Amino acid sequence: MLYYAVVFFVIAIIAAVLGFGGIAAGAAGIAKILFFVFLILALLSILSGAFRKK
């Protein structure tokens, strides 16, 4: 039981360092860009599939 407590404590410390540091803002910016890229790719895939069936 103590082993799991130490493991979760270490994970919490790592998450705090990454979250409270400047890495979170940079990752959020990259995530926004990737969201729009994959949204466009999904729409293109749906449209090409719709036109291919006709």
From Swiss-Prot:
Q: Which residues form the signal peptide?
A: none
Entry annotated with the keyword Cell membrane: yes
Q: Which Pfam families match?
A: DUF1328
Compartmental location: Cell membrane
Q: How does it sit in the membrane?
A: Multi-pass membrane protein
**InterPro entries recorded for this chain?**
DUF1328
Membrane-crossing residue ranges in chain numbering: 5-25, 27-47
HAMAP family given in the database record: UPF0391
> Its family?
Belongs to the UPF0391 family.
The entry's protein name is UPF0391 membrane protein Bpet1858
Species the sequence originates in: Bordetella petrii (strain ATCC BAA-461 / DSM 12804 / CCUG 43448)
